């Protein structure tokens, strides 16, 4: 006779793949046009001067230059800009 019960199956054991969100280029760094600055869900950080926004809210550089983070408006929303190289 069997001394153990049959091992049942589990309903766990799976997880979603990470989406690799976050800041890709930090303040003060130089960046080329078209390079991704931030990948995000929603507009946690808003685009400033010379920064474009993709349909998935990804922020990217429109020109070659230096990345600068700051705040804008009375509500102090986070913003990222690209300053042209001088």
UniProtKB/Swiss-Prot annotation:
UniProt keyword Nucleotide-binding, yes or no: no
Protein name: Large ribosomal subunit protein bL27
HAMAP family given in the database record: Ribosomal_bL27
Highest taxon, organism lineage: Bacteria
InterPro entries: Ribosomal_bL27 (IPR001684), Ribosomal_bL27_CS (IPR018261)
Biased composition (Gly residues): 1-10
Keywords in alphabetical order: Ribonucleoprotein, Ribosomal protein
GO biological process terms held by the UniProt record: translation
SUPFAM superfamilies assigned to the protein according to its UniProt record, in alphabetical order: Ribosomal L27 protein-like
Disulfide bonds: none
Region (Disordered): 1-20
Family statement drawn from the similarity comment of this UniProt entry: Belongs to the bacterial ribosomal protein bL27 family.
Record-level GO cellular component terms: cytosolic large ribosomal subunit
Molecular function per GO: structural constituent of ribosome
Organism name: Polynucleobacter necessarius subsp. necessarius (strain STIR1)
Keyword Ribosomal protein in record: yes
């Amino acid at each position: 006779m069997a001394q153990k019960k049959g091992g049942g199956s589990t309903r766990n054991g799976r997880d979603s793949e990470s989406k690799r969100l976050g800041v890709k280029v930090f303040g003060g760094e130089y960046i080329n046009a078209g390079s991704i600055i931030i990948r995000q869900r929603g507009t946690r950080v808003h685009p400033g001067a010379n920064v474009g926004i993709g349909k998935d809210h990804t922020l990217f550089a429109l020109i070659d230059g230096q990345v600068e983070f700051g705040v804008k408006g009375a509500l102090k929303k986070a913003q990222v800009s690209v300053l042209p190289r001088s």
